[in-house]
């Protein structure tokens, strides 16, 4: 579960390395974000020459969490780190590649484009 002030890694090649959550979208009582939720983030670390700069504010969709997700068959998928993919104003991925695995739960949230860019879908 991701809340305000959480530090996440960026799983795409947009140029950002680490971001901090500054707002969880989805209503006034939405305090934590889970897999597939959209949050507003600020870039804390970026590589030189990337598409994004340090201090920029973007939306991002969460693709991996430490708390994981429980599937209807009872299995649980957890990851070592929290990660997201940065989105532009039209809610499309900024990067052209997604590093690491993503989960099938993104399909229900209408993020098929991220699934097609990913190396592996669990």
UniProtKB/Swiss-Prot annotation:
This is Large ribosomal subunit protein uL14. It comes from the Bacteria. It comes from Rickettsia felis (strain ATCC VR-1525 / URRWXCal2). SMART domains: Ribosomal_L14. The lineage of its organism: Bacteria, Pseudomonadati, Pseudomonadota, Alphaproteobacteria, Rickettsiales. InterPro entries: Ribosomal_uL14 (IPR000218), Ribosomal_uL14_bac-type (IPR005745), Ribosomal_uL14_CS (IPR019972), Ribosomal_uL14_sf (IPR036853). Part of the 50S ribosomal subunit. Forms a cluster with proteins L3 and L19. In the 70S ribosome, L14 and L19 interact and together make contacts with the 16S rRNA in bridges B5 and B8. Keywords: Ribonucleoprotein, Ribosomal protein, RNA-binding, rRNA-binding. One of its GO terms (cellular component) is cytosolic large ribosomal subunit. The gene is rplN. CDD domains: Ribosomal_uL14. One of its GO terms (molecular function) is large ribosomal subunit rRNA binding.
């Amino acid at each position: 579960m991701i809340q305000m002030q959480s530090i996440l890694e960026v799983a795409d090649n947009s140029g950002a390395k680490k971001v901090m959550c500054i707002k969880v979208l989805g209503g006034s009582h939405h305090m934590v974000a889970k897999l597939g939720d959209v949050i507003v983030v600020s870039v804390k670390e970026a590589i030189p020459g990337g598409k994004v700069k340090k201090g920029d504010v973007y939306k991002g969709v969460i693709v991996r969490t430490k708390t994981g997700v429980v599937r209807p068959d009872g299995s649980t998928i957890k990851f070592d780190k929290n990660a997201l993919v940065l989105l532009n104003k039209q809610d499309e991925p900024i990067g052209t590649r997604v590093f690491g695995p993503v989960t099938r739960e993104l399909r229900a949230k209408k993020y098929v484009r991220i699934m097609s860019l990913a190396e592996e879908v669990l």
